[in-house]
C-alpha cells in the first residue's frame, strides 16, 4: 500500500503509545506527537498602547513583560486556521521550514493615502457617474 508521509503523520518512532492532549481550539483529544505545536511569545500590552504605558511608568527604561503561551492544535484545526497548509504530493517531502515573511517597510506609501495617484476607473465607472433622468 502506498504511503502519504514518511512518519505517518506522527513523531512516535519506536514508541507503542503516546498520551493524548486536548486541542487548544476545539478540545478534541489528539496524540501529543501528532498535534501541531506552536509557542507564541507576544507583548502583554498591545502595540497601540505601549507608548502610553511607558510614559506613565515610574521606572525609567522599564521593559514590559511578555506573554508566553504554548498552543497545541489537532490537524483539522491547524489546517482550518492556516497554522499549517496543505502541500502538494512532491512538496510533502520537503523538510526545510517555510520562509518567514519579511515585515513591510514603513516608507512605502499605502494605497489610498495622500500623495498617491487615484486608481484608473473601470468599465462600469462611466455608467455609474452619468446622471440618471
Swiss-Prot record:
Residue ranges with Low complexity bias: 113-133
GO molecular function: mRNA binding; structural constituent of ribosome
Pfam families in the cross-refs: Ribosomal_S26e (PF01283)
Keywords: Ribonucleoprotein, Ribosomal protein
Lineage: superkingdom: Eukaryota
PROSITE patterns assigned to the protein according to its UniProt record, in alphabetical order: RIBOSOMAL_S26E (PS00733)
Residue segments, region Disordered: 86-133
InterPro entries membership: Ribosomal_eS26, Ribosomal_eS26_CS, Ribosomal_eS26_sf
Single biological process term from Gene Ontology: translation
Regions of compositional bias (Basic residues) in chain numbering: 86-95
GO CC, alphabetical: cytosolic small ribosomal subunit; Golgi apparatus; plasmodesma
Protein family: Belongs to the eukaryotic ribosomal protein eS26 family.
UniProt cross-references to PANTHER family, sorted A to Z: 40S RIBOSOMAL PROTEIN S26
Name this protein carries in UniProt: Small ribosomal subunit protein eS26z
Amino acid at each position: 500500500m502506498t504511503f502519504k508521509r514518511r512518519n505517518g503523520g506522527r513523531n512516535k518512532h519506536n514508541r507503542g503509545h503516546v498520551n493524548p492532549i486536548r486541542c487548544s481550539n476545539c478540545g478534541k483529544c489528539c496524540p501529543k506527537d501528532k498535534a501541531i505545536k506552536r509557542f507564541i511569545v507576544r507583548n502583554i500590552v498591545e502595540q497601540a498602547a505601549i507608548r502610553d504605558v511607558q510614559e506613565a511608568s515610574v521606572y525609567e527604561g522599564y521593559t514590559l513583560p511578555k506573554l508566553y503561551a504554548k498552543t497545541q492544535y489537532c490537524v483539522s484545526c491547524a489546517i482550518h486556521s492556516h497554522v499549517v497548509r496543505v502541500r502538494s504530493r512532491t512538496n510533502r517531502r520537503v523538510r526545510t521550514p517555510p520562509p518567514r515573511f519579511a515585515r513591510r517597510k514603513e516608507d512605502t506609501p499605502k494605497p489610498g493615502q495622500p500623495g498617491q495617484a487615484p486608481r484608473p476607473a473601470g468599465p462600469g465607472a462611466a455608467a455609474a457617474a452619468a446622471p440618471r433622468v
